[in-house]
């Protein structure tokens, strides 16, 4: 029976199409590292700076394009305005494959989401973010594009204001629609901003309602602590991953499994990745291989030279999705997630370092069942 399931899921992977929907924006990154922080407070001055880097941002670009680079068949679903920034987003995506823009919707009513990333001399990055079209992305934008797909991944519900309206009912309806078509569902998060709409949601109440319709949920340590362990997050901040041990991860992922997911996990940055799975019947219900049922593991990160961590969590999710869809062992799934994240952080942007699935497997010595 195990062999039958394994072969069945392997065949499904070869024919699969993954939809990545949600947050999509353009990052504008001016080179201002030569300007001291104090000079930013001096109004009316002309400061000579370096060139601006233009990069795609958000889960749709980061996870979606990582999946594309790994060789998966992927559809990107987002919303852009009919404006110059929207044109830039479309052009940047089309450089990878013109077909990838087929499900990017355009609108005349909302300006395209963007962020300006500023890193003054000797300081950490600051983000100036315009929600725009990301906040306006609606359920119908996604459900229109589900035909023929086998997996739906939604990136960053805290930023998807329209989907989170009315106690996240549009988001929940979208997930239900996907599962009713026998699609596997997953979501990725961001840390809620206490000064923005995402910081006003009652996550301890809403998350169980959402996760009842999610099959795979692997947030970062900071994200899940901010949502379900706010006291710990207040103490640890973005260094949560350094404080989480086996017992903490086991208990927290146990809560996520009780909320309904089939595969729960925590992305732990330089400390690796923890995964825990539900029982056999739940995995079959999620269209996932039952051979990984009732397991848990902690996979250490791979030692690489880090140039930038932008998109590392998104890249990790891409590796996890590919491994799960190919019915690999839980060890292989976790290793592939960590390996794709390792490739990501070796470059300054989110996608440039991602290699093909074969190249990634060979480089990191990851076992693969054909």
Language model features with spans:
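Structural recognition of alpha->loop->beta junctions
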Residues: 96-99, 200-227, 290-295
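Active-site beta-loop-alpha junctions enriched in small/polar residues
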Residues: 157, 190-194, 222, 269, ...
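Conserved N-terminal subdomain of the carbohydrate kinase-like
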Residues: 39-54, 69-158, 360-370
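Glycine-rich phosphate/adenosyl-contacting loop at the front of the ribokinase-like
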Residues: 3-79, 84-98, 300, 305-307
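Conserved phosphate-binding/catalytic region of the ribokinase-like
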Residues: 9-22, 176-177, 209, 228-370
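Glycine/threonine-rich flexible loop motifs
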Residues: 159-168, 197, 227-228, 235-236
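Short beta-strand/loop segments at the ligand-binding rim of alpha/beta enzyme cores
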Residues: 181-190
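Charged helix-capping and loop-helix junction motifs
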Residues: 166-173, 199-206
């Amino acid at each position: 029976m195990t062999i039958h399931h394994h072969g069945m899921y392997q065949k499904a992977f070869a024919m699969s199409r993954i939809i990545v929907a949600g947050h999509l924006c353009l990052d504008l990154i001016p080179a201002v590292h030569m300007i001291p922080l104090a000079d930013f407070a001096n109004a009316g001055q002309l400061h000579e700076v370096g060139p601006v880097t233009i990069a795609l941002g958000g889960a749709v670009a980061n996870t979606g394009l990582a999946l594309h680079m790994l060789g998966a068949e992927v559809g990107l679903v987002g919303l852009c305005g009919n404006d110059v920034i929207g044109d830039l987003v479309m052009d940047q995506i089309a450089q990878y494959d013109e077909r990838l823009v087929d499900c990017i919707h355009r609108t005349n009513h909302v300006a395209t989401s963007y962020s300006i990333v500023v890193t003054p001399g000797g300081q950490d990055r600051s983000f100036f973010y315009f929600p725009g079209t990301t906040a306006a992305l609606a359920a119908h934008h996604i459900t229109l594009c589900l035909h023929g797909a086998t997996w739906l991944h939604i990136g960053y519900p805290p930023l998807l204001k329209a989907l989170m309206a009315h106690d996240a009912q549009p988001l929940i309806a979208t997930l239900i629609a996907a599962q009713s078509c026998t699609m596997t569902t997953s979501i990725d998060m961001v840390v809620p901003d206490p000064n923005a709409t995402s910081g006003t949601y009652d996550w301890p109440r809403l998350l169980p309602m959402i996760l009842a319709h999610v099959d795979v949920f692997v947030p970062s340590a900071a994200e899940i602590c901010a949502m379900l362990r706010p006291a710990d997050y207040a103490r640890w901040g973005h260094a949560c991953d350094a404080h989480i041990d086996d017992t903490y991860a086991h208990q927290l992922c146990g809560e996520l499994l009780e909320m309904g997911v089939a595969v729960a996990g925590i992305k732990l940055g330089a400390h690796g990745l923890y995964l825990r799975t539900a029982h056999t019947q739940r995995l079959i219900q999620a269209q996932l291989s039952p051979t990984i049922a009732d397991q848990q593991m902690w996979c250490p990160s791979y030692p690489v030279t880090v140039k930038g961590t932008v998109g590392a969590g998104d890249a990790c999710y891409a590796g996890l999705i590919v491994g799960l869809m190919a019915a690999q062992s839980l060890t292989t799934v976790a290793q592939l997630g960590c390996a794709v994240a390792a490739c990501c952080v070796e470059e300054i942007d989110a996608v440039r370092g991602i290699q093909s699935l074969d190249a990634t497997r060979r480089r990191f010595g990851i076992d693969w069942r054909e």
